[in-house]
Amino acid sequence: MRKITVFGMGSFGTALANVLAQNGHDVLMWGKNVENVDELNTHHMNKNYLKDAKLDSSIKATVDLNKAVQFSDIYLMALPTKAIREVSKDIDQLLTSKKTFIHVAKGIENDTFKRVSEMIEDSISSEHNGGIGVLSGPSHAEEVVIKQPTTVAASSKDNNVSKLIQDLFMNDYLRVYTNNDLVGVELGGALKNIIAIASGIVAGMGWGDNAKAALMTRGLAEISRLGEKLGADPMTFLGLGGIGDLIVTCTSTHSRNYTLGFKLGQGKTAEEALKEMKMVVEGIYTTKSVYHLAQQEGVEMPITNALYEVLFEDVPVSKSVRTLMERDKKAE
């Protein structure tokens, strides 16, 4: 049995905390919302994110950051990408020894274009950094928490960290593979959110399977082009952290990114759609980051460009689609 602190009380962090507790580990969750913390401690539920799920009664929660930091040597960073750097810096101020950091965020930082592991590495002093890894793949929290079969990938620059993640999380309903391509696994998880929004738009506009299949296929090509330019192994994008995550996010109403896109396809503005959803949609921020990153790296990403225009330049969806379809003739 290990002690593990989960930073963040969203849907995926909660589902994974439940996995860890059911695997026999001692789990403490940290969050800022007092009502969420009280609900988890008293009723063993997190209705804001996982409405009807009854969680393992051994899981505890706190709003006390110092208590959370001192509780364990293994940290699961289940926070939105935009919160990772700030919380990591706050954690570092309270550390006196090395800790292992496992993150599940799927995004790229807006200003720096850095991956989440790089953000954590920047924020944690070397004397406190005992290794950084990621757990990623096709894994809706709503399915994980009710023990539906799920398979994901664990990756780190340190193979010992990858194996630790595998050992902590793997059980009879959650299968974990190790993967030594940290860059590829992180990029696959982040970039697929862009394509998921676009996929939701296609569905919201009422288009058929032809359009959906083409979008996912050409979307995977974009992801692979940028990933390879940034040092990823192209084969990673054919695995769980790539096409696996892409398929599940582009085809399910569990996906916030797909749901946002669906609302856009039905004619709502991004502002209207987000107001209805009341949840973080990583793909919006990732679209902005990747649009500028692709320009900086000289990588062609037409779907990303079209979505950027819709989200940030108020270009009508119908016009962006027409622009995509009328691009110059090319070989595949």
Curated annotation (Swiss-Prot):
PANTHER family: GLYCEROL-3-PHOSPHATE DEHYDROGENASE (PTHR11728), GLYCEROL-3-PHOSPHATE DEHYDROGENASE [NAD(+)] 2, CHLOROPLASTIC (PTHR11728:SF1). NADPH binds at S11, F12, K32, K106, A141, R256, V280, E282. NCBIfam families: PRK00094.1-2, PRK00094.1-3, PRK00094.1-4. One of its GO terms (biological process) is phospholipid biosynthetic process. Keywords: Cytoplasm, Lipid biosynthesis, Lipid metabolism, NAD, NADP, Nucleotide-binding, Oxidoreductase, Phospholipid biosynthesis, Phospholipid metabolism. Catalyzes the reduction of the glycolytic intermediate dihydroxyacetone phosphate (DHAP) to sn-glycerol 3-phosphate (G3P), the key precursor for phospholipid synthesis. It is found in: Cytoplasm. Sn-glycerol 3-phosphate binds at K106, G137, S139, K192, D245, S255, R256, N257. The active site is at K192. SUPFAM superfamilies: 6-phosphogluconate dehydrogenase C-terminal domain-like, NAD(P)-binding Rossmann-fold domains. GO terms for molecular function: glycerol-3-phosphate dehydrogenase [NAD(P)+] activity; NAD binding. It holds the Pfam family NAD_Gly3P_dh_N. InterPro entries: 6-PGluconate_DH-like_C_sf (IPR008927), 6PGD_dom2 (IPR013328), G3P_DH_NAD-dep (IPR006168), G3P_DH_NAD-dep_C (IPR006109), G3P_DH_NAD-dep_N (IPR011128), NAD(P)-bd_dom_sf (IPR036291). Belongs to the NAD-dependent glycerol-3-phosphate dehydrogenase family. Pathway: Membrane lipid metabolism; glycerophospholipid metabolism. HAMAP family: NAD_Glyc3P_dehydrog. One of its GO terms (cellular component) is cytosol. This is Glycerol-3-phosphate dehydrogenase [NAD(P)+]. Its EC number is 1.1.1.94. It catalyses: sn-glycerol 3-phosphate + NAD(+) = dihydroxyacetone phosphate + NADH + H(+); sn-glycerol 3-phosphate + NADP(+) = dihydroxyacetone phosphate + NADPH + H(+).
